Amino acid sequence: MMRVLVVEDNALLRHHLKVQLQDSGHQVDATEDAREADYYLNEHLPDIAIVDLGLPDEDGLSLIRRWRSSDISLPVLVLTAREGWQDKVEVLSSGADDYVTKPFHIEEVMARMQALMRRNSGLASQVINIPPFQVDLSRRELSVNEEVIKLTAFEYTIMETLIRNNGKVVSKDSLMLQLYPDAELRESHTIDVLMGRLRKKIQAQYPHDVITTVRGQGYLFELR
C-alpha cells in the first residue's frame, strides 16, 4: 500500500484516479491546485505524487522544480496532453521521474507508479549518524535509539538542518528559508511551533533536551 498525492485540476479525472487508486488499496490525497498539494506533501508525507501540468495557480512543471529545489525527492509521475518530444524532455528535465500521455488507461498509471517505487526503493541509503540519533536522508526519517520518530515533512526538514549543523547555531531565518523558499509564504511563528512539537517527540525517546534556543541567534542541536 502506498500513500499517493494526486494533483489534477479536472474534477472528473481527479475523482476517477482517486477511486481507482483507493480500490487498489492505496491511501489517496487529491487536490486541484499547487497550494493544497504543498500542504498534503508537508503534512501527510506521500510516497509518490501524480501531477498534471495545467494547474490553476501554478504550472505543474514549476511546482515540480520547486519541490526539487527544496530537496523533496519523492517520485513524481506527470500527466500530460503534450505529445511532442521537446515537451517530454522538458517534463523530465524539470525533475519528474516519468510521464503518462493523456488519454491513458488507469492500468498504465498503476504500472508506472509501481515501477517508480521499485526504482526508488533501490536507491542507496544516505545516513547521518550522531549516536543515538540517525537521519536517513533517502527515507527522510529520524531515528533515536533505533526507533523511528514520526515527523511531518516540515519537522523533518528542521531536524535534518539542525543535525547537519551539529554543534552550530542555525538562525531562525535560515530555518524559515528551508521551509518557505517563497518569502511571501513565510510565517514567523511557524518555527516556534515546530520546535515545540519536535522537542516533545524527541523527549519521548531521549530524556535530554538536545535542541537549545540561543536567544537572539537561533537554535542549536547538541548532545550533552
Swiss-Prot record:
Residues annotated as domain Response regulatory: 3-117
Keywords, in A-Z order: Activator, Cytoplasm, DNA-binding, Growth regulation, Phosphoprotein, Repressor, Transcription, Transcription regulation, Two-component regulatory system, Virulence
Subcellular location: Cytoplasm
Protein name, as recorded: Virulence transcriptional regulatory protein PhoP
Species name: Salmonella choleraesuis (strain SC-B67)
Keyword Transcription: yes
Pfam families (alphabetical): Response_reg, Trans_reg_C
Function: Member of the two-component regulatory system PhoQ/PhoP which regulates the expression of genes involved in virulence and resistance to host defense antimicrobial peptides.
